[in-house]
Design a protein with these regions (language model features):
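Metallocofactor- and cofactor-centric catalytic cores in central/energy metabolism, strongly enriched
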Residues: 1-220
Length: 220
């Protein structure tokens, strides 16, 4: 029984996992749905019209503190999850980066996945319910291969390496990429990987050592 248990406890072999091209995948989100930064001459009136309680008050406090930090030449670091990118807010974040208001961005590994896919094909967010049924969930090969390539760059953080790669590879929709814009503007974009929580970690091409090292560089 102990021998069987030891055998059963061996790590699974990922080499036989089947991947497919992301170009064949149905996506739930595309760049046509993205938000766009626009100028509002009287936007202050809208902000002032909001209730003086709870979320609206919190929003005003965030705005005030960002403005104060910017005016005092302090750092404004945006820490985001993947939904900021998935839900079409990248262009607004990029606009704030270009204006010198956001001075650094920290994102999780899923954020990097969405950012890369949007830069490559102009869409992201697979149909999870469908792909779980047929076993294809997370198996788009281009995303995993690109992030692994970036992670393997010596002494470079994953965020910068992936941003550089998006620019070097001339991804068709790179103007929607926070990672690429960070590399172009030389603004720190850090990616904080959590092994096992992101779809690409199932791919045979992925090196846990490279993921850990490149993300640790970003952490530092």
């Amino acid at each position: 029984n102990l021998k069987k248990q030891k055998k059963a406890n061996k790590p699974i072999d990922l080499e036989k996992i089947k991947t497919y091209s992301i170009k064949k995948r149905k996506n739930l989100v595309n760049i046509g749905q993205s938000g766009k930064p626009i100028e509002f001459k009287n936007f202050n009136k809208f902000i002032d019209s909001l209730p003086k309680v709870l979320a609206a008050d919190a929003l005003r406090n965030v705005i005030d503190n960002i403005v104060k930090a910017h005016n005092k030449d302090r750092q404004v670091v945006l820490a985001i999850g993947a939904h900021v990118i998935k839900c079409g807010l990248s262009s607004i974040v990029i606009d704030l980066m270009k204006r010198g208001i956001i001075t650094a961005v920290a994102m999780n590994g899923a954020g990097a996945i969405h950012d890369y896919e949007i830069s490559l094909i102009g869409g992201t967010s697979e149909d999870v319910l469908h792909s779980l049924k047929d076993g294809t969930f997370g198996m788009a090969k281009e995303t995993a291969e690109a992030i692994q390539d970036a992670a393997s760059v010596p002494e470079c953080g994953l965020g910068r390496a992936l941003g550089d790669k998006i620019i070097k590879d001339k991804n068709k929709h790179k103007q929607y990429s926070i990672l690429a814009e960070g590399a172009r503007l030389n603004i720190p974009i850090t990616v904080h990987v959590a092994i096992g929580t992101e779809t690409i970690h199932m791919h045979p091409c992925i090196s846990g050592a490279d993921m850990g090292e490149s993300s640790h560089v970003d952490f530092r």
